[in-house]
């Protein structure tokens, strides 16, 4: 029978509920338990697929094609368990499901209301499909007091009564700010946050308190007294150098022991933390440093590239080097020479994106990398722009462009109208909806023998996650290959180009998929490990 841990947040947003949930999941896994993590998002969008990356951050794509919150990326990276579309739900999805049921007549003429219909839908989502798990950790997005989160708070309150006694625990993540003028940490924001949570009928069992310095014992006693929580369950969550130190830090503070104690479970056996300790040691004691330039268009919010950043760090962990990131807005290269920005870097990465803005800058970055022999990694849009660059400057197709930017006589990159998923043919049109209509999720690809990328993977058959609606036009394949660009990976039916490379370049690879989504600190993705290794070689030449 599954036990449930509900994680709420208070005082301010962005305290790290996702990291806390993921770290707790990793600690319970390290004790041998089977863990599932789920995210409840209060916004009205059906999913984050059409939300601006500069507002919401990255859209994390699962194997089964769901566009989800970036916290699911943390869940996967910390636990190694692949998330599914049933691990993330939004208010928009819930209301859509309810309205569809009402239109079908499923409610038999009843007046559809927030209680019980919305709350029941939330409870069903939380509790369904958990037969194979020992613990289900549910993170509730937003902050206690947000009007959007009220139905979720009510639902998890009800679950405290609906579930068998002793199978639901509430963890409240809060902030204890330091006031320089007073020279002390303040408990009042946490007291008010807990009071607001209690007013909703939820009484936290554990307080996880973020702070930038040690919390004195007297302040812990005060929180215990005023928040009605055992003193041992007031857990300090101090700032750490790397998010991969968090599982070790939380175990040291006793979070996993307190969670088990709240369920009446003896905290044995001790968690096996050797792998996490090795990762932490590699991060603390690098044997070198490389600088990677990320030429993107959403650089104003680094969370737009969250999985990408972590995957690069994973490559650094694999090679025992520190990875330093240089962020460059791609529009800069439309007006200025890339050389002054890129001459001293050891690798260039052009990530995914949508739309024409900044595209010429990405093309110029790809040209610089090709001509100067600097390691280049093009992901999704970054691969497409590398192909456009080759078409223009190697194949002499001066008007080469993408139909994403408007009509063109040389559509080197075009809209996909149909593709094979499993045994079924999927079709799309330019007039269709934007949401959920891309080529999403895991697809297989066949790699060409004796290519660099086949050597990196060590296998000719791979599966990677996609999120795109435009694709390199296979009709240009022969013209481009005659100029030295190798199409090193194709879809199994040979219709969709998946990877490209230059055999005469130290490391120039483009991929149509998003390998960063499958990288883990305990299991770095081979492409990122190889890219950082190539950057390390480049650092010895610069």
From Swiss-Prot:
Residues reported to bind CTP: 13, 146-148, 186-191, 222
UniProt GO molecular function: ATP binding; CTP synthase activity; glutaminase activity; identical protein binding; metal ion binding
Reaction equations catalysed: UTP + L-glutamine + ATP + H2O = CTP + L-glutamate + ADP + phosphate + 2 H(+); L-glutamine + H2O = L-glutamate + NH4(+); UTP + NH4(+) + ATP = CTP + ADP + phosphate + 2 H(+)
EC number: 6.3.4.2
Region (Amidoligase domain): 1-265
Pfam families according to UniProt: CTP_synth_N, GATase
InterPro entries assigned: Class_I_gatase-like (IPR029062), CTP_synthase (IPR004468), CTP_synthase_N (IPR017456), GATASE (IPR017926), GATase1_CTP_Synthase (IPR033828), P-loop_NTPase (IPR027417)
Record bears the keyword ATP-binding: yes
GO terms, biological process: 'de novo' CTP biosynthetic process; pyrimidine nucleobase biosynthetic process
Pathway stated in the Swiss-Prot or TrEMBL entry: Pyrimidine metabolism; CTP biosynthesis via de novo pathway; CTP from UDP: step 2/2
Annotated control of activity: Allosterically activated by GTP, when glutamine is the substrate; GTP has no effect on the reaction when ammonia is the substrate. The allosteric effector GTP functions by stabilizing the protein conformation that binds the tetrahedral intermediate(s) formed during glutamine hydrolysis. Inhibited by the product CTP, via allosteric rather than competitive inhibition.
Gene Ontology cellular component annotations, sorted alphabetically: cytosol
Function comment: Catalyzes the ATP-dependent amination of UTP to CTP with either L-glutamine or ammonia as the source of nitrogen. Regulates intracellular CTP levels through interactions with the four ribonucleotide triphosphates.
PANTHER family: CTP SYNTHASE (PTHR11550), CTP SYNTHASE-RELATED (PTHR11550:SF0)
Subunit text: Homotetramer.
The protein's name: CTP synthase
Source lineage: Bacteria, Pseudomonadati, Pseudomonadota, Alphaproteobacteria, Hyphomicrobiales
